[in-house]
Regions:
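Long, low-complexity, charged/polar intrinsically disordered regions in eukaryotic proteins
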Residues: 42-99
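Long, charge-rich, low-complexity alpha-helical segments
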Residues: 15, 20-56, 99-161
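Short alpha-helix
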Residues: 1-11
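Acidic/polar loop patches that form or flank catalytic/metal-binding clefts of enzymes
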Residues: 9-16, 62-64
């Protein structure tokens, strides 16, 4: 953090924030600064070899991209159809990252969303194309959005149609 600070930058977020999530090990002590919680989670996990994050100029101070407006283009890492089939069949999505494991339980309707994640259409377009009620779609997407914490989902307009 001192290197960023010296360069006039601040950390906007980590590429895989789940690595720095202290709640995987213990409750965050009251008053503990976030930088210390990240360092403690890192020490407890023992799996972080390289830190990868997003830096912005201090004057910008913004967080990760928000999907709330619907204009973001989600990009899924991996084979979207394979993920869709697995979710349709089991309603579960196993998550693994350098010794960190979890399982996301999802309604089988989520498979339609995974199938539509082509890296070209915005969330609003995907929602309209799936035929899922807009309120239900947003509720369901809120359950999928944490995939970005695992490095399995990001937002990009590079391939936008």
């Amino acid at each position: 953090m001192s290197l960023l600070d010296a360069g006039g930058l601040s950390l906007s977020g980590f590429c895989q924030p789940v690595r720095y999530d202290l709640s995987r090990f213990a409750a965050r002590p009251d008053g503990m600064p976030r930088e210390e919680t990240w360092a403690l989670a890192e020490a407890l996990s023992g799996t972080i070899k390289t830190h990868v994050g997003y830096a912005v100029h201090k004057s910008e101070s913004r967080g990760p991209a928000s999907w709330a407006t619907g204009d973001k283009v989600p990009v899924l890492q991996g084979d979207r159809q394979q993920v869709a089939r697995a979710v349709a069949k089991t309603g579960r999505l196993p998550l693994k990252l350098d010794g960190i494991s979890a399982e996301m339980r999802l309604p089988k309707d989520a498979a339609r969303i995974f199938s539509a994640l082509d890296g070209r259409r915005s969330l609003a377009e995907i929602g309209a194309g799936t035929g899922i009620d807009p309120v239900a779609f947003r509720t369901l997407w809120a359950r999928l959005a944490p995939l970005s914490d695992w490095g399995l989902l990001h937002y990009s307009n590079l391939n936008r149609v």
